[in-house]
């Protein structure tokens, strides 16, 4: 049974952590990986240790922790405090804007922030609003955390302001998607490949400089800082030399394996159906209207579920008879 609230801010509550079974891709259990991640956060200043349970006052709301197991990520289940938050709508850039943003004969680069939410520090007087408990200790967040529904808007507004500044004052074309950005050769000038390469490299160097001044860290492993003709951004392979979009082989294989698994089982959970529909629609730029036609039945089922016409969100749905 749910609980009703009639107040302007969340009452104090303590929730238990929700650890998934199994091991992460690093070979650790969820609590082990989470504890290591929390210790790293304390070391960087993104998380603050309050003290041991029973020796210090807990945060106003003790939120449950969980771990995304595939690509290990610490998740703060902030659904409780999110009920009292009202983030504004915003629109993210997409791969579909590449043709209108970058020159057709230009090269491309991209960078990806590392722990980007940690660039947004919380005022010390507000850090006790919510936190968590692990291994008998209370912690609060000293910077942004994954799970609080206000963070995407804050992140988007701040990062796009940086990119727009670079576009206005340095003429650097770019697109941004939360912690990920794409840049390319500058407009103007001739079509000399050497000059196109030089301008693209200069552009990404300026963007990196601005990011460091703004307090962001960049993941070298996830970034492509050397200008190139072929680059994968937001799951789509962009061929700037041929002016074409492609589906990366790994992504194509992942979707095919998912579809074959569903076919063999004969049914699918609602959560997996939502994920499958999203994955297929993300291929729209490369396969065109076929993505909409293929997923039409998926979205029809999801709409009927939301209207209460069929099943519940916990039931499995049969797509094959």
Regions found by a protein language model. Give the residues of each.
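Beta-sheet entry/capping signal
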Residues: 64-65, 71-74, 105-109, 172-175, ...
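Active-site palm subdomain of RNA-directed nucleic acid polymerases
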Residues: 152-207
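Helical (often loop-to-helix) elements that flank the catalytic cores of nucleotide-handling enzymes
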Residues: 190-213, 241-254
